[in-house]
From Swiss-Prot:
Organism: Bos taurus (Bovine)
Positions of region (Disordered): 398-421, 450-469
GO MF annotation list: structural molecule activity
Protein name as annotated: Keratin, type I cytoskeletal 26
Assembly, per entry: Heterotetramer of two type I and two type II keratins.
Note from the entry: There are two types of cytoskeletal and microfibrillar keratin: I (acidic; 40-55 kDa) and II (neutral to basic; 56-70 kDa).
Amino acid sequence: MSFRLSSGSRRLCSPAGSGQLTGGRTGFRAGNACGGLGAGSSFSGPLGSVSSRGSFSHGGGGLGSGVCTGFLENEHGLLPGNEKVTLQNLNDRLASYLDHVCTLEEANADLEQKIKGWYEKYGPGSGRQLAYDCSKYFSVTEDLKRQIISVTTCNASIALQNENARLTADDFRLKYENELALNQSVEADINGLHRVMEELTLCTSDLEIQCEALSEELTCLKKNHQEEMKVMQGAAGGNVNVEINAAPGVDLTVLLNNMRAEYEDLAEQNREDAEAWFNEKSTSLHQQISDDAGAATAARNELMELKRNLQTLEIELQSLMAMKHSYECSLAETESNYCHQLQQIQEQIGATEDQLQQIRMETEGQKLEHERLLDVKIFLEKEIEMYCKLIDGEGRKSKSTYCKSEGRGPKNSENQVKDSKEEAVVKTVVGELDQLGSVLSLRVHSVEEKSSKISNITMEQRLPSKVPQ
């Protein structure tokens, strides 16, 4: 089973295959730094890299500019230090999760190997099949497995949709917070520009006041000059002629014109200096504002990309944890099923062992019964042999008696011959059996008939009853 991780998608693909994490070009991308999850199950990024062996190495992928570094390192920037710790914790958790997945895969492979060995030993293809046939339940179990897998997949998809909705809401919240921070920074810049404008207005008002003072002074000088001219004209209108050899008088018009030109040059110089100072300050301030705005935009874009990658990784981690939980549930269910099957097999083995023990005991009982019957047979054969010997002995005795009585006379010899001819021996063996077929007792009846005289000889031998099994 393969899991494909991509930075542009929050979906989880799980086609059938090997249990190895593969992915395209995903990771924390900042500037020219990028990373991915490849065939070696490793994760790399500008903040560090994680491999499937659980090691964490700090990578050196740059963030593009010194301004971004300032935002990351400054505690008052847009990316505080706790998010670095969060990313490092996520990398560590991903590494430990990959180790746990490898351990579970090894345990699953071990269980599958044991199950395969058990099927090779007791399966349909082997000669040692179990007495109980479970093949009729295979279709039901397969149907239940398919239903469980479909329900588990549906639950995982619903959980993934819920997580996507929550992450979308978090995206909008973060976007709102970023826009609010940007608005506040712009308002702060506007307030700073307002203060600069107020300073420039105060400077302009001071210059206007100085210009008004100079204009008033010029007006006063003009007024004094006119009064002096009137006085001089009134004095020149009399009859007194006074000739004085004096130095030539000062030309007030030229003096005033020179003073006016000097003050105008001074005012123009002050105005040019103020305008140059204002332009210089405005240019540097505008340049600083544009630089700060560009740096803030770049840092904001970088931060948004990092947050987007973080959210993607969190979604993938949640999906992997859900899949891991489903695999653990399936493994526990499989273990419980096989434990139940093993318990049933052990019960069948115990029942078979009990049956074998009972058969063994019955065999022992039948063996004892056979030995007992064999003893009875031997005893009966001995009795028969003894009776045969007795009969043979009585026959010889009767013959000897016949030979002795032969010379006594014809009458006695005729009677003896008649008696010997009429002599007969009848033996009857009567046995008692119980319900199991065991011999309880034997009776042997011997009947001798000699010329209408019957003698009954009864032998009885009691045998012990069969020992109950």
